[in-house]
Amino acid sequence: MNNSEQLIALKESETAFLKYFNKADYELVDFSVVEKLDWKQLNHEDLQQMGERNFWQHEHQIYALRNDFTDQLLRYYSMYPTAATKVAYTGLIIRNNEAAVQVGLENYAPSLANVQQSLKLFIQFIQQQLRDNVHFVVLGHYQLLDALLDKSLQTPDILSMIEERNLSGLFTYLSTEHPIVQILKENTQQQLNVLEHYIPNDHPALVELKIWERWLRTQGYKDIHLDITAQPPRSYYTGLFIQCHFAENESRVLTGGYYKGSIEGFGLGLTL
């Protein structure tokens, strides 16, 4: 496929996504790739992200190129509330001077049924339009770390070792018998079963993970992995996250996650 054909295919995929979810009664939204920011309203995490963003000042006003749709929509709807409970978008994101096209959905005040229906529709779109299918699924939950590791041990060094799955380092800092070490020693397909030995059965994170695992299996997905190593990209990501990896295009990953800041939601996104 030459450059012209790739460009046409990309634009057709964007248009098809909007048509597909418009037909499914999602509200379509179109926001400028240039965000107008107020320094007084930016928090510590916003400022940390400026390292990967392109931004500039003009007449005492700060502007930045969009680097995250969920973050942009959350910021906008916090100031201008919407009655929409589910929205669909397409457009550019720019991170570290690299531009990419992303398509995605946001469910606001989400119910489990609505989020799972959104995921089903998203995967159906990928099957029909992109001619691809889910190869395996990764589940995780951002409350697991607090359930498995005392706050006093959540130092930058230890968190980095967990994220890198550095077992030799964790042996030294935590001990070979620590729950995190014991879980990481297992195959990721078995870790959800092992997790049950280290946190109470009624822990909200474990309950939610088991609900999702059962539902995914009813949808025909058998290759399900647990990730206890991921750190939330923003503090408002406080719940379950999911990654759907595909069979044909291994570089594409459908990602989703629950968040609760000034707005509660569950987002799903795919970079084309």
Residue ranges and their predicted role:
Residues 1-272:
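TRNA-recognition modules of translation machinery and tRNA-sensing kinases, especially anticodon-binding
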